Amino acid sequence: LGVGRGGRVTRLSLPARLEGCYLGVSDLGLDGDIPGFCAEALLHEAKKQNMRGIFADIEADSPAARALLGPLDRLMHEAGLPLFVPLRQAGAVEHALLVAETAISGGSLDGYFEELQRQYPGRIAATLRPVSADFRLPAQDSEGHPLTEKERRALQHTCGAQAFFSRELCAKYFTYMDERQNGHFVLYDDRSTLEAKLRRLDALGVKHIFALYPDVAALL
C-alpha cells in the first residue's frame, strides 16, 4: 500500500496474491493532516490479507510521518503484530522494530549493530543493501559515487587493482589513483560478502532481515 497527502491510502499492484508475508507501506508524498483512521485502515488491511505484520518504509522525518507512525505503532502493538520502520523513525515509535542498513562505509558492522542493540534492546532489524561506491580520498561523505556492477568491474580491470576483504565493514574494496593522481577507495559487496553479513547478523541475534530481490538475486 501507499500513503499520500492527507493520509490517502492507495493499493499498489502485485504480480500475485500473497499471504503470510509482511504488508509493505510506501510513502507516496505523505503530507498534510493525517486522520486517525489511516492507521486503523492499514491494520485492517494487514489482518484482512492475513499478513504477519507491516513494514512502513517511510523515511521522511515530518509531522505527517509521525502522525501516522505513532498511532500505527500503538495499534500494531495492541494487536500483537510487529511493525517495522526505518531506524531514523526511532523517535516516532515506542514499540516498533527499527530497521538499520548493513551498507556502511566506516567503523565496524559488528560494532554498529551492537551499539544499536544496546540502545534499543530487542528492537533491531536489518535491511541487506549491497554497497557499490567509489570514494575519492579523503572521503567527503559516507555515500560516495554509486557504481553499477558493470562499471565497477570495468574500473577494476582498467586499473588492474587487487580486491581485499575488510573484516570491519564485511565488504570488499580496492584502491586506485585517477589521472589527476587523486586517491580512490572502491567499496562493494558480492555474494560472498552478503553471505558473510547474514552470518554476522545471525551471530549478533538480529532475527529480522529484509532485502530487495534484485539486490540479493545472487543469493537465491
Name every feature range the model reports, one short phrase each.
Residues 123-197:
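Glycan-binding loop/region signatures in secreted carbohydrate-active enzymes
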Residues 56, 126, 201:
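Conserved, mostly hydrophobic/aromatic
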Residues 197-220:
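Acidic/aromatic/glycine-rich contiguous surface patches that form carbohydrate-binding/processing clefts
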Residues 37, 41, 67-71, 108-111, ...:
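Extracytoplasmic/secreted proteins, especially bacterial periplasmic and envelope-associated proteins
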Residues 64-82, 163-174, 178, 218-220:
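Short acidic, glycine/proline-enriched helix-loop-strand junctions
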Residues 66-67, 74, 81, 111-138:
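Active-site region of glycoside hydrolase catalytic domains
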Residues 1-108:
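Chitinase-like catalytic core of GlcNAc-active glycosidases
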